[in-house]
Each structure stands twice: as C-alpha cells, then as structure tokens.
C-alpha cells in the first residue's frame, strides 16, 4: 500500500478532516484511486476491520475487501457528481450491521486529490467527548512516543500512557498552545527536551470553540 506524502498529524489539520479526529462518525481518507487508505480516525479503522491505525496506514493490516469494493463502486460515481453514497455491512460490535457512508472528492493542501468517506453516527451511539478523545489517543498507539488530546487552557482531556514521561510544565504547554493559535496552517512542529531525551513533537489545533488540540 502506498503511503501518503503527508504525516498523520499533517492530514489531521486539513479542513475536511480535523472535525473527525474527535467524532462519533467513522472517517477515512482514501487515495484518488480508492486503493490506499491515507488517513482514518479510530472508528474508521474499526470500520475496515483494523484494531489500530498504524497497521492499517502502514499497509500491515489488510482492510476489509468487501467494504473496499463497495466504497470503490460508489466512488466511481464521483466522476459525474460531487457526492456519492454507499451502504456497507460492517462488524463493529458483536454482530454485523449496515452502515451508511457518504463520499466526497477532496483536494489536499499539497494538491493531491483524495476521497473522503464518512459514516452516519456509528450504529446510533452518542459519544461523550472524553470517550472520543480516549479512542483517538488509543488509536494512535505506535505512531510515536506519546499522544494526547489537549483542551483550551492546557487541560489534558485524554493521553496515552507515556505522555506523562514528557514531563511538560503547564507554562511550556500553554506556550505551545499560544504558538499554534497563531499559525494559519493550525500546526507546529518542534524539538522538545524531555527527561527521556530530545523528542520531535507536532501540535495540531483541531477546533477553535472550544479549542482542542492533538
């Protein structure tokens, strides 16, 4: 499977995607050919039968072939229209269920074309923000040393087990939040000195009111 030229956090700040990091809907970003999965949220990975994002995006896990065929058939309609729809049968709990999907063409910030696939709310579930945040960081296991969803004032909404090892002070964290708030592309990347060594970090501003960050 071909990799995107953009990293997960680079794609997370795309206008079409940033609202789906914390969402009750499954979201997938597929290549223009619909053969490659470029990005997904936690429920998007589950929709394709993957337990985590890293294996799916690195090509180590094979996405559900039947669902990919159905998405591909629906995506062929995008040559004549702006939107398309598909109904797929996915195993999201104890038994398979029908999930409605909407497909739209997207042009990414780097000029690449892609197809965004978004489900209706997953089998009627209503997530609390804490649940969505925890699902997001758990899905990112293996992408880096640590991850977290951070609120407007630097509060940690959810974090991976290793995030505490970064030992970031409130002042340091709020300084980074102030920096990213000034960036038009909603993203900063820095080297951070931590007790476990110098680590490259990325901070993405996902939402503004209230502010939410990855």
Language-model segments: residues:
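Short, charged amphipathic alpha-helical "coupling" segments at sensory-output junctions
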Residues: 1-19, 118-136
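PAS/LOV-family sensory domains
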Residues: 19-21, 140-141
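A short helix-to-beta-strand capping loop
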Residues: 23-28, 144-147
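Sensory/regulatory domains in signal-transduction proteins
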Residues: 25, 30-135, 162-214
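PAS/PAS-like sensory domain loop/N-cap motif
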Residues: 34-35, 147, 154
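Extended, non-transmembrane interaction/recognition domains
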Residues: 150-151, 166
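Amphipathic, soluble alpha/beta structural segments
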Residues: 151-153, 161
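Structured alpha/beta or helical-core interaction and ligand-binding surfaces enriched in interleaved
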Residues: 157
